[in-house]
């Protein structure tokens, strides 16, 4: 899980989700998991 100021989808499978006002990216590739700071 990377915590970043700006999250961007890395590949086609990355999905942007908003949970409790926090932008998250989930993906099959666990290295692509991100959360906005």
Curated annotation (Swiss-Prot):
PROSITE patterns, per the entry: RIBOSOMAL_L36
A single GO cellular-component term on record: ribosome
InterPro entries in UniProt: Ribosomal_bL36, Ribosomal_bL36_sp
GO aspect biological process, one term: translation
GO molecular function terms listed in the Swiss-Prot or TrEMBL record: structural constituent of ribosome
Keywords recorded for this protein, A-Z: Ribonucleoprotein, Ribosomal protein
Family assignment from sequence similarity: Belongs to the bacterial ribosomal protein bL36 family.
Protein name: Large ribosomal subunit protein bL36
Gene expressing this chain: rpmJ
């Amino acid at each position: 899980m990377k915590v970043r100021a700006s999250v961007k989808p890395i590949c086609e499978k990355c999905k942007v989700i908003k949970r409790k006002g926090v932008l998250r990216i989930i993906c099959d590739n666990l290295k692509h998991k991100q959360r906005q700071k």
